[in-house]
Amino acid sequence: MQKTEVHSPYNNPLPMDSSWLETLQKIGARIESGVVRDFGNPTAERQATQSSAIFADLSHLAALHFSGKDAESFLQGQLSCDVKAIPQGGSSLGGYCTPKGRMLASFTLLRTQDGFVMLLSTSIAAAIQKRLAMFVLRSQVKIDMPGDGIVLIGLAGPACRDAFSESFDGTFPAGLQVFQLFGERLLLLVPLSSAPATITGICTRFVPVGSGDWQWIEIFLGIPLITAPTQDQLIPQMANMELIGGVSFKKGCYTGQEIVARTQNLGKVKRRMYRAHLEVEASPGDELFSDDLGAQVSGLVVNAQPAPGGGCDLLAVAQVGSHDSSTVHLKTPDGPALKFIPLPYDIT
C-alpha cells in the first residue's frame, strides 16, 4: 500500500498511509510535520475543546505492541504502573524509568485483545522499543510497532461515550477497539480498512480538531508527555505521575522502583509539575528561572500548546518553594513570568 512520507515533531520521520491521509484531507485536515495541524479554523477548534465533543487524529503518538504469553509479566517488571490491574479494554498512565528513577518515557498503556499497546511520543518511540527489547532475554515477548495497519483517534468532551455510541447507532466498524482514558476520554484503535467508516460515524457527533488541541486537553488535565527534550530529567513524582494513576507502590519491583519508592516514603518532593499560562510561545525542555534562585535553573517546560483564549498553556516542573512564594520566568531570570493555573487534582 502506498505511503506518503511525513515528519513527526523533533524530525522523526513516520509513514502516514496515503489512504488515511486522504480520509483526513476529505474532511478538511491540514497536515504539517506529520500531524494534523487543524481542520481549517484553528481558533474555533481550540474553543471547541472547552465545551464540545471533539475528536483528533493522534499521529503525534506512536504505538508499541507487546504480545506473547510473558508480555504482562515482562511489562510489570519494567514499568511504574500496575500492568496486572489493567482490565480488558482499559488503560493506565505510566512511566518507564532508568535505574536512577528518571523517566525515559511517559505513556498510556492499553490492554488489547492480543496483548498490550503503549502509546508514547513519536520522538522517543524507536529508542524505547530498542531499549525494552534488550531486556526481553528468554521471555516470550514480541515488541513491534504496528503503525502500518492501525490509526489512533482520540475522543473527548461532554458525554463522550454516549456521543460515541450514538455515532454508530450500536453497530461499530469491523475491528474497532475502544479504550477508556484518564479524564473522561476515549481512545479508538482502528484498523486502516475501517478508518473511513469510523470517521464518517464520529463526524456526526464530534468536532474534528488538530493534534495540538488534543495535547492542550492533556495539559488541561495535567497529563505529562515526555518527549526527546525532557527524557531522563524527571522522576515520576516531579511530573505528578503518582497523582494520576501512573505509579503503583504495591506492585513490587520494576526498573527505578527503589528511587521512586524512597522519594515517596521520605515525603520530600522538591519539584512538582504545575499548569501555567504565558503570552509568548514555549517549548518542551525550555529552562525556567525564579526570583528566589537567581541564575540557578528552577525547572523546565514539559509540554506547551496554544491556549483557546490566546497565548500559550503549559505544564512546567518547578521548585515547590518557587511556585509558592516567588515568580517563575521562562528561559532567563528576567524572562516572561508564568501565571500559574490550578490543576484538576490536588498536589499539596
Give residue ranges: language-model regions:
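Acidic, proline/glycine-enriched N-terminal capping motif
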Residues: 2-93, 97-98, 102-104
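Glycine-rich, small/acidic residue-mixed loop/short-helix segments
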Residues: 10-12, 239-247, 261-348
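Hydrophobic/aromatic-enriched cytosolic interaction surfaces used to assemble or bind macromolecules
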Residues: 12-14, 38, 114, 174-175, ...
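Short amphipathic beta-strand starts and helix->beta connectors
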Residues: 42-51, 90-106, 136-139, 168-176, ...
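Acidic, low-complexity central loop/insert segments
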Residues: 54-55, 63, 86, 105-221
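Short glycine-/aliphatic-rich beta-strand segments at the starts of folded cytosolic domains
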Residues: 56-77, 144-160, 268-279
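Intrinsic-disorder/low-complexity, polar/charged segments enriched in Ser/Thr/Lys/Arg/Asp/Glu/Gln
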Residues: 61, 115, 185, 258, ...
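Anionic-ligand-binding alpha/beta catalytic cores of soluble enzymes and soluble regulatory domains
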Residues: 189-277
